[in-house]
Design a protein with these regions (language model features):
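Catalytic phosphate/metal-binding cores of nucleic-acid and nucleotide-processing enzymes, i.e., regions
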Residues: 2-158
């Protein structure tokens, strides 16, 4: 199957649990993380392997230039995110998809981490996941983490 995702979507053996890292620019330095760069690749990876085969999923919020611009131009100074200004799907869209997938397939979510540098985006994802877990009468455990990673810096100027 040649759909542009290359080797990143290799199906794991049934007994191997997957650690998935969603980030458009950074790559974890340590661990056995599989890296996906955007929403479509994220969804395809989970559909291929099955949600039940994931141990941990770590989400970034800002997955493209318009998301970063919204963070620097609006979220950072005004403490809010206007999702209408963001063209690309974000980590929040991935969180919504995960919850829908969990509900539809009746599969519990794996441990969800958020490693985004955007504190408002992180809080939105964490709140969404933990509210879902609480509604399902499950322990809340979605947390913000720092995972050592390669550094790719993007600067945006007015």
């Amino acid at each position: 199957m040649n759909d542009g995702f290359g080797d990143k979507r290799k199906k794991k053996m049934k007994n191997e649990k997957i650690y998935l890292y969603l980030d458009d620019t950074r790559t974890p330095k340590e661990g056995n993380w599989e890296v996906v760069r955007g929403y479509d690749e994220f969804v395809a990876h989970i559909r291929l392997n099955g949600l039940e085969n994931y141990e941990v999923i770590s989400l970034d919020h800002d997955l493209g230039e318009s998301a970063m611009e919204e963070y620097y131009n609006n979220a950072k100074p005004n403490f809010e995110i206007n999702y209408k200004n963001i063209v690309e799907k974000t980590g929040m869209d991935c969180a919504r998809w995960l919850v829908a997938e969990s509900m539809t397939k009746e599969i519990p979510l794996p441990q969800i981490y958020v490693h985004s540098a955007n504190p408002i985006g992180s809080a939105n994802i964490i709140g969404y996941i933990n509210n879902y877990l609480k509604n399902q009468r499950l322990p809340t455990g979605c947390v913000s983490v720092k995972i050592p990673h390669t550094i790719t810096v993007k600067q945006f100027y007015d």
